């Protein structure tokens, strides 16, 4: 008997036979609107490469292409104990990372909840004091206070900051609900180091990093086939190693000990790709999301691919279908009319609904929005969620294909992290299929030359590996960034 392998799981979605013609017509229209074919993807990739290159010029472009000041590849042999901190919107994460020197590491971590009003305190010292006190608590917990050697620390600071060297970060503007005066325009490293020193903690901040660059470096440490770090979450971003000679905007700004063939990690911040709307296949719903956003005309790519906007797209389509008199008739939709009431967990849960009658979807709409749905309506909603999620995945991989083509990568691993990548049903498969369609690969998908794989912990292990590389440069007396920085 021929062994055919495991049976495919039964398709969850039932037949569309009971869906009225007027709703089926809408489903077909939505399919036409949200489906992105291979030819369109390739067109997007071509323009993406142009914009990546433009971002490296002195004049610049839509994509910032920020040098990350990591100028070596990890060897995987880096070893020792390092601290990493990650300042998020609600928690501070403190991590002790033990690099073993054989491409592996161990981590021990604690989370410290930010006091409710900390993000808007009028006294910036309170934030740095809180972080330093948390570090002290962690040092006591881990019995590290009496360590003879100074512990190098990598600081993951995922807020817009300009860097002229690895161990500085001048905050451009607060995001994620922070609004603390007298920090924007200042280097955050000495602000924190000052509070650490006041407490006589044996810690030195040697690197300030972006989480996407951290994802690239942590994954490269364990897997030298890593070509990129990417985030598919509330935002979208990518990081990769370019070569100094290709970064025109650094011409004449680097010391002689940074040769032109030196690698340089680049934090793309490519959520702003195609702000002119030249190639992205926007629907009227994407236009509405943009126009109603706090910054119209900005972050065009992010608004079509990131988790932050997927639920909002779903909400806008449903409201329009209701206005046409096609569904959710004669009901109070006041809750559904609140912008961003549907976060990404909604389309994710709807796509994951295991029941033939889409019972979970029915519960979601009744309990959370006070709205009753018919089975045909739920089938339309489910199909719409699939379309929005699949489109996001297919467009999101255009950034990957563009960087791989720009750098001439024919094979390799793309290390991915973020809530959408990790939790959104079908996203990984749709992303892999998107890459296959761009490149025209056929045959066994597991043998694809470029594959997206789960990333290592960028803001913890990545910060630690970068701290190790930075510490080595400091010890060797090498420059850490722009001349005079």
Curated annotation (Swiss-Prot):
Residues 210-457 are annotated as: Hexokinase large subdomain. One of its GO terms (biological process) is fructose import across plasma membrane. Substrate binds at residues 158, 175-176, 210-211, 237, 269, 302. Transmembrane segments: none annotated. It catalyses: a D-hexose + ATP = a D-hexose 6-phosphate + ADP + H(+); D-fructose + ATP = D-fructose 6-phosphate + ADP + H(+); D-glucose + ATP = D-glucose 6-phosphate + ADP + H(+). InterPro entries: ATPase_NBD, Hexokinase, Hexokinase_BS, Hexokinase_C, Hexokinase_N. Residues 75-209 are annotated as: Hexokinase small subdomain. It is an enzyme of class 2 (transferase). CDD domains: ASKHA_NBD_HK1-2_fungi. Pathway: Carbohydrate metabolism; hexose metabolism; Carbohydrate degradation; glycolysis; D-glyceraldehyde 3-phosphate and glycerone phosphate from D-glucose: step 1/4. ATP binds at residues 86-91, 111, 307-308, 344-348, 419-423. Gene3D superfamilies: 1.10.287.1250, 3.30.420.40, 3.40.367.20. GO terms for molecular function: ATP binding; D-glucose binding; fructokinase activity; glucokinase activity; hexokinase activity; mannokinase activity. It holds the Pfam family Hexokinase_2. Keywords: Allosteric enzyme, ATP-binding, Glycolysis, Kinase, Nucleotide-binding, Phosphoprotein, Transferase. Belongs to the hexokinase family. In yeast there are three glucose-phosphorylating isoenzymes, designated hexokinase I, II and glucokinase. Present with 40800 molecules/cell in log phase SD medium. This is Hexokinase-1. It comes from Saccharomyces cerevisiae (strain ATCC 204508 / S288c) (Baker's yeast). The lineage of its organism: Eukaryota, Fungi, Dikarya, Ascomycota, Saccharomycotina. The gene is HXK1.
């Amino acid at each position: 008997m021929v062994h055919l392998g495991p049976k495919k799981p039964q398709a969850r979605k039932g037949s569309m036979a009971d869906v009225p013609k007027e709703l089926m017509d809408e489903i077909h229209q939505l399919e036409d609107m949200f489906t992105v074919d291979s030819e369109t993807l390739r067109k997007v990739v071509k323009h993406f490469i142009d914009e990546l290159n433009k971002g490296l010029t002195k004049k610049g472009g839509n994509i910032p292409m920020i040098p990350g000041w990591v100028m070596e590849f990890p060897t995987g042999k880096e070893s020792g104990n390092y601290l990493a901190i990650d300042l998020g919107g609600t928690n501070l994460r403190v991590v002790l990372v033990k690099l073993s020197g054989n491409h592996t590491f161990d981590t021990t971590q604690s989370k410290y909840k930010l006091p409710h009003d900390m993000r808007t305190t009028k006294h910036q010292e309170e934030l740095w004091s809180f972080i330093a006190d948390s570090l002290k608590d962690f040092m006591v917990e881990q019995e590290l206070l009496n360590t003879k050697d100074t512990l190098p620390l990598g600081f993951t600071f995922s807020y817009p900051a300009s860097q002229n060297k690895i161990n500085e970060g001048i905050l451009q503007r607060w995001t994620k609900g922070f609004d603390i005066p007298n920090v924007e325009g200042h280097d955050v490293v000495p602000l924190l180091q000052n509070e650490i020193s006041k407490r006589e903690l044996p810690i030195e901040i040697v690197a300030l990093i972006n989480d996407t660059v951290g994802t690239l470096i942590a994954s490269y440490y364990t897997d030298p086939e890593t070509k990129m770090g990417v985030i598919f979450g509330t935002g979208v971003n990518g990081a990769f190693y370019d070569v100094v000679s290709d970064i025109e905007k650094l011409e004449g700004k680097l010391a002689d000990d940074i040769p032109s063939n030196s690698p340089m990690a680049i934090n793309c911040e490519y959520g702003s790709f195609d702000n002119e709307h030249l190639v992205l296949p926007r629907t009227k719903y994407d236009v509405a999301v943009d126009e109603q956003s706090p910054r119209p005309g900005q972050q065009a790519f992010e608004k079509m691919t990131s988790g932050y906007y997927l639920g909002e797209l779903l909400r806008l389509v449903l409201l329009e279908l209701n206005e046409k008199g096609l569904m959710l008739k004669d009901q109070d939709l006041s809750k559904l009319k609140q912008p961003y009431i549907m976060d990404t967990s909604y389309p994710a849960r709807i796509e994951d609904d295991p029941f033939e009658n889409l019972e979970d979807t029915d519960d979601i709409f009744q309990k959370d929005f006070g709205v009753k749905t018919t089975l045909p309506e739920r089938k339309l909603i489910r199909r719409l969620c699939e379309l929005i999620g699949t489109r996001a995945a297919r467009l999101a991989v255009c950034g990957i294909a563009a960087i791989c083509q720009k750098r001439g990568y024919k094979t390799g691993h793309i290390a991915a992290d973020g809530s959408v990548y990790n939790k959104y049903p079908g996203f990984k498969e749709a992303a892999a299929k998107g890459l296959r369609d761009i490149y025209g690969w056929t045959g066994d998908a597991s043998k694809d030359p470029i594959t997206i794989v789960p990333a290592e912990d960028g803001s913890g292990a990545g910060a630690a590996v970068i701290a190790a590389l930075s510490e080595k440069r400091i010890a060797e007396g090498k420059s850490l960034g722009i001349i005079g920085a």
